[in-house]
């Protein structure tokens, strides 16, 4: 989100990549409809489906609600933060409340494309922004900042 600046993913060339046609529910809103939106940049048709099912909102057919309705955007962000592990072993929420470290939040949210040396510049950018936020809040960032 660029530090919570952008509501939608900025790289439009990526938009068509977030449709997994192997899922039984497909991509009814169109192949390019499931790009990153909201505070955690919810992406992929299967995440829109799961978030929508959990929240009682048809996000599979109406993914634009995440960018057009701030309440929906924050609900999806909190849903992902609290329930999804991504390629990691814990949710981002569990990582923070159990003091496992900020690096586990990166792994839970973007581990497939950033962790394990896949995009060290992006990981560093996230860590730097996190350190700036913790400084503004007058707290320490803790350990295990990287994934």
State where each predicted segment sits:
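Flexible secondary-structure boundary motifs
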Residues: 78-89
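Surface-exposed patches in mature extracellular/periplasmic domains of secreted proteins
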Residues: 5-7, 88-101, 141-145
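Peptidoglycan-targeting cell-wall enzymes and recognition modules
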Residues: 1-80, 101, 105-108
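Extracellular low-complexity, O-glycosylation-prone Ser/Thr/Pro/Gly-rich "stalks"
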Residues: 84-86, 103-147
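Alpha-helix capping and helix-loop boundary segments enriched in small/acidic/polar residues
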Residues: 68, 96-97, 118-121
């Amino acid at each position: 989100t660029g530090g919570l600046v952008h509501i939608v993913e900025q790289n439009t060339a990526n938009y068509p990549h977030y449709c997994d046609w192997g899922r039984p529910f497909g991509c009814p809103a169109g192949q390019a409809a499931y790009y990153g939106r909201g505070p955690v940049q919810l992406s992929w048709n299967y995440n829109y489906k799961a978030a929508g099912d959990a929240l009682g909102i048809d996000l599979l057919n109406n993914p634009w609600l995440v960018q057009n309705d701030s309440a929906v955007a924050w609900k999806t962000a909190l849903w992902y933060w609290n329930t999804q592990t991504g390629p990691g072993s814990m949710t981002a929420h569990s990582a923070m409340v159990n003091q496992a470290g900020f690096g586990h939040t990166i792994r839970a949210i973007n581990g497939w494309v950033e962790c394990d040396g896949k995009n060290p510049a992006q990981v560093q950018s996230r860590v730097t922004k996190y350190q700036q936020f913790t400084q503004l809040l007058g707290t320490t960032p803790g350990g295990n900042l990287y994934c």
